[in-house]
Swiss-Prot record:
Coiled-coil features, chain-numbered ranges: none
Disulfide linkage: none
Protein name (record): Chorismate synthase
One Pfam family per UniProt: Chorismate_synt
C-alpha cells in the first residue's frame, strides 16, 4: 500500500492498524530546536482519546505516545521524529463473523477488490483509529508554528449533528472545550446529548459537520494554481476517515449569492493594513491567504458500524445479513474535531515553510510608493 504520507516540506507518514500491536507517525521536515515532549503531545491526544464519555466509542485506549527519535533534550533535531502509540484495548473477537463478509458503508469491499487481502479486525488501516497518529503529529506541527509564526490559533468545533444545529447567534469560543461535542453553543448541549443517545438506543448513528478556523495566519501563504493553500486544505480534510464533502469560506452557499454579495470589500485600516468587510472567501483568494481567518468545514457521514441488520455479500458472492458488533462511535464527527485541527496545523505549517523557502518575506507592501 502506498500513499500513506502527506505534505511537501513538513511531511507526515502514518502507519499501523486498528487492532495491530501499535500505530504511529513519522514526522519529517520539522525544523530543529522546536520544543517537543511526550507530555505536550499527550495533551492533544487526550482530546481525541476514546472511551472518555458515553457519546463516543467505549473502546478505552490510553493513547500514550512515545517519541522514539528526532528529539534530544526536549528539542527537535531536524531529523525524522518517530511517534508510537500502542493499542491496548483491542477486542478482535467481535469481528470474527465479518472475516468473509463485507460491511455496508465500509472500505472492506474496496480494500479487498484492490489488494486481494484485508485486515478485517476493526477495519484495519481504514479505521478512524489511524487518526490518533495524526493528532500526535499535529502536536509537533503546532509547536513548530509557535516558533515560526507565533499568534496563529487553530480551533475546531461541530456545527451540526444530524438534525441538530448550533445557533450562531449564541456562538461562544469559550464554550467549545467545555462540552463533549466541541460545540460553541452551550445552551444546545443537552439537546444534542438527548438526540444522540436516542439514536444509540435505536442501534443507529448520525453524521455531522465540523468547522475549523485558523486565526492569525499571515497574508501571502499559499501559491497559485496547483499549489493553492485551499487545495491542500481540502485534500487534508478529505483524507480524514468518513469525510464526504469539504467547503472553504462560503462554500456551496456562494453559488446562491450575487457577485455584489460574495466579494469581500477592502478598506485600509488605521494601522495601515487592509481590512475586509466580510470573509466569504474563507481567508483565501487565488490560493493565497489574505490575513483573515482561514475557515474550512466538512461533512462526516454517519458511522457505518451499527447494530441494525443490513444486507450485503460474502467473499464468495453469496448474500449475507450483517450486524456489526464491536464498540463504535454513534457520531464519528465528535472525535474528528481534534483530527481536523491537526490537519489544519500540518497544512499551514507546510505552506509557511514553502513560502519562506521560495519568497522569504512578503514582497508586496500595500501603501508603499511605487
Amino acid at each position: 500500500m502506498s500513499m500513506n504520507s502527506f505534505g511537501h516540506l513538513f511531511r507526515v507518514t502514518t502507519w499501523g492498524e486498528s487492532h495491530g500491536p501499535a500505530l504511529g507517525a513519522t514526522v519529517d521536515g520539522c525544523p530543529p530546536n522546536v520544543a517537543v515532549s511526550e507530555e505536550m503531545l499527550q495533551h492533544w491526544l487526550d482530546k481525541r482519546r476514546p472511551g472518555q464519555n458515553k457519546n463516543t466509542t467505549q473502546r478505552n485506549e490510553p493513547d500514550a505516545v512515545r517519541i522514539l527519535s528526532g528529539v534530544f533534550e526536549g528539542k527537535s533535531t531536524g531529523t525524522p521524529i518517530q511517534l508510537m502509540i500502542e493499542n491496548t484495548d483491542q477486542r478482535s473477537r467481535d469481528y470474527g463473523e465479518i472475516a468473509q463478509t463485507f460491511r455496508p458503508g465500509h472500505a472492506d469491499i474496496t480494500y479487498f477488490q484492490k489488494y486481494g487481502n484485508r485486515d478485517y479486525r476493526g477495519g484495519g488501516r481504514s479505521s478512524a483509529r489511524e487518526t490518533a497518529a495524526r493528532v500526535a503529529a499535529g502536536g509537533v506541527a503546532r509547536e513548530a508554528l509557535k516558533s515560526l509564526a507565533p499568534g496563529i490559533e487553530i480551533k475546531g468545533y461541530m456545527t451540526r449533528m444530524g438534525e441538530m444545529e448550533i445557533d450562531r447567534a449564541r456562538f461562544d469560543w469559550s464554550a467549545i472545550d467545555q462540552n463533549d461535542f466541541w460545540i460553541p453553543d452551550a445552551a444546545a448541549v443537552q439537546d444534542w446529548e438527548d438526540y444522540l443517545q436516542a439514536l444509540r438506543k435505536q442501534h443507529d448513528s448520525v453524521g455531522a459537520v465540523v468547522e475549523v478556523v485558523a486565526r492569525g495566519v499571515p497574508a501571502g501563504i499559499g501559491a497559485p494554481i496547483y499549489g493553492k493553500l485551499d487545495t491542500d486544505l481540502a485534500a487534508a480534510m478529505m483524507s480524514i476517515n468518513a469525510v464526504k464533502a469539504v467547503e472553504i469560506g462560503e462554500g456551496m452557499n456562494a453559488a446562491l449569492l450575487k457577485g455584489s454579495e460574495n466579494a469581500d470589500e477592502i478598506f485600509m485600516g488605521n494601522d495601515g493594513a487592509p481590512v475586509y468587510s466580510s470573509n466569504h472567501a474563507g481567508g483565501i483568494l487565488g490560493g493565497i491567504s489574505t490575513g483573515q481567518d482561514v475557515v474550512i468545514r466538512f461533512a462526516v457521514k454517519p458511522t457505518s458500524s451499527i447494530l441494525t441488520p443490513r444486507q450485503s455479500i460474502r467473499k464468495d458472492g453469496t448474500a449475507a445479513e450483517v450486524i456489526t458488533k464491536g464498540r463504535h462511535d454513534p457520531c464519528v464527527g465528535i472525535r474528528a474535531v481534534p483530527v481536523a485541527e491537526a490537519m489544519m496545523a500540518f497544512v499551514i505549517l507546510d505552506h509557511i515553510l514553502l513560502h519562506r523557502g521560495q519568497i522569504g518575506e512578503n514582497q508586496g507592501v500595500i501603501g508603499a510608493p511605487d
